Amino acid sequence: MKTNYEKVLFIPDIHCPFQDDKALEVFYQFVQWFKPETIFIMGDLLDCYAISRFTKDPNGALKFQEELDTAVSVLERIRHLNKKAKIYYIRGNHEARIQKFLWNNAKELSGLHALEIENLLDFKRLGIEYVKDGMMKYKGIIVKHGSVVRKYAGYTAKAEFEKNGCSGVSAHT
């Protein structure tokens, strides 16, 4: 029976490797039960802590490859639970840390395709479409990682609506 609605799922700000594994397990169970037709991973799947400009805990010794491996395993699990879903990955501000790190520390490597997020996280193999500019319009709704933050409840949504002229779904805030 054909329905006149679409099952869409939004998941923002997992921040691997600092993810909450219990919350992620609940999310996986929900994906399996809900069977969404479209999934938006709304940025900041990676934290990129190892390459951030912030002071690092020397006892942590977290490696960037560990962050990537954790994020790929999350994506693989999502894909395994729903092989038919269209999956979009919206760029977040933490993914932008990769490019900034290269610009500041290894300009000569900044143009390598192998170091682009879609290759580091194996989007092609997993059938994930990358939204590089961090925002897309999907069936009349803006979907983005977002950066607008306001002090009072509801003001962020109002500011986003005024900026974009339509309803939307934002992460980050």
Predicted regions and their residues:
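Acidic, His/Gly-enriched loop-helix segments that form or flank divalent-metal centers
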Residues: 100-173
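Short, flexible coil/linker segments at or flanking structured domains
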Residues: 2, 27, 86, 131, ...
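Core catalytic region of metal-dependent phosphoesterases/phosphodiesterases
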Residues: 6-7, 11-124
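Beta-strand-turn-beta hairpins that frame and shape the catalytic cleft
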Residues: 1-9, 135-142
